Amino acid sequence: MNESSVSRFENITDDSGNTNGGFYYLKCNWQYNSFTIYLTDLTNVWSSNVTTKYIENILKPQGMSFDQYFQLLKKSLLKQDQTKREFDYKIDKYKRKNNNNINNNNEDIEFIIIIILSEFDNINVKSSIPLIKLSNHFTTFQHYFDWLFDKYQSLSLQNQTLTLQTQSLQSQFNQSLEQNKLFQLEKDRIESNLIEKFIIILNEKKKKIKEYKQPINNLLLEQKSISSSLSNCKCNNNNNNNNNKSIVNNNKNKSPSKQQVYTTPKKKKRNYQSNLINIDNDDDDDLGNNDNVNNINDENDNDNDNDNEEDYKPTFNNSTPPLLDLLSNDYDSYYNVPTNVRKKFKPTPTLTTTTTTTTTTTTASIIKTPTKKRNSISPQKSPHHHRNINIKKNNNNNNPSSPMKKYNANGTLIPNNNINSLIPITPMKSKSKLFNFNDDDNHDIGASELLNDL
């Protein structure tokens, strides 16, 4: 395959002195693995035939393939690299060796091509092509002009074919424009038809939407009215309930307190029980019994949180009714035992009875069972076991704690203001478990008989 190329080189370093300098024209005839080069300065012509063997043995560097090097060499000769980043060029004198004698021909030159492999690492490949000056310049120039004429003819033929292609393409373009116009007209017509149909459908849809909206709005209005009426009813009911509650609260405030009615006998009952147990509370020299009674009283005070002693405080004045004095000499003359206590007392056998007499008037011995610590004995909370309370009467009136009756000149009773020895008369219910008796008959006894039995 033969291929020819012509290129122009300028600003080449010339150290030979055989050229005119300035512009150089380079023509190459390319074969498969070789080429023929012609260089002229428009005055002289230099030529050389570069064979494959010369390229393989002399020009190609070691470690590079032949094809890679040949492609780089061809690229450097087809067009000058003005930037000098890939290729650089230089012309120098050629020194020929003949029969071990160096014959310097001043008319021959050497065309040097520098291939730059790495600009930063400064790796270059230098290739020198010797050129011999031709004696017949006319034949060489004839070859140049023949090539130029052939090149012009080939280019003209290519131009004609390209113009024909351009005309055909232009005609196709014009036809496509006409078709596009027709398509645009048809598109506009179809769009107008579709818009007309769509408007009709849209109007029908709007009518249906209006028809469906009207009942929905009516239903919403009805729902709002119903909800408002329900809210009003609820408000009225709430107001009525509040009024009823206020009326009930007022009635409760006006009605007498039930708590006072229930607590009064309870307080009196507990005070009576505590006074009943603490009859011998004046004596400070009891052996064992005083400690038991005091422990029981302490337990009762802790359970009731001192409420009974703070709430109920008996008062004694001239208007106070006569009080029950269980330690006096005359029982039946002036005092009576309450009716609910005035029963026949039938003592039952007791477990143990211990009586200790000291300098005090009376000693009561109580057998204490293990119970929780309480301040006073209550009939409801006391353990179910038999007790025997022994009270002895002593006629020794020298004891200041013993209550005694005193009368005026008119014969009226003077009340004793010694609160510790006075017990107010309060109604007391019969407690069979406390006194250990059987209520099996209706026979009433007096206070003296009851005390004698005790």
UniProtKB/Swiss-Prot annotation:
The gene is xrcc4. One of its GO terms (molecular function) is DNA binding. Keywords: DNA damage, DNA recombination, DNA repair, DNA-binding, Nucleus. Involved in DNA non-homologous end joining (NHEJ); required for double-strand break repair and V(D)J recombination. Binds to DNA and to DNA ligase IV (lig4). The lig4-xrcc4 complex is responsible for the NHEJ ligation step, and xrcc4 enhances the joining activity of lig4. Binding of the lig4-xrcc4 complex to DNA ends is dependent on the assembly of the DNA-dependent protein kinase complex DNA-PK to these DNA ends. Residues 298-310 have a biased composition (Acidic residues). InterPro entries: DNA_repair_prot_XRCC4, XRCC4-like_C, XRCC4-like_N_sf, XRCC4_N, XRCC4_N_sf. GO terms for cellular component: DNA ligase IV complex; DNA-dependent protein kinase-DNA ligase 4 complex; nucleus. Belongs to the XRCC4-XLF family. XRCC4 subfamily. The keyword DNA repair applies. It is found in: Nucleus. Residues 233-258 have a biased composition (Low complexity). It holds the Pfam family XRCC4. This is DNA repair protein xrcc4. GO terms for biological process: DNA damage response; DNA recombination; double-strand break repair; double-strand break repair via nonhomologous end joining; response to X-ray. It comes from Dictyostelium discoideum (Social amoeba). Its main location: nucleus. Residues 233-324, 368-402 are annotated as: Disordered.
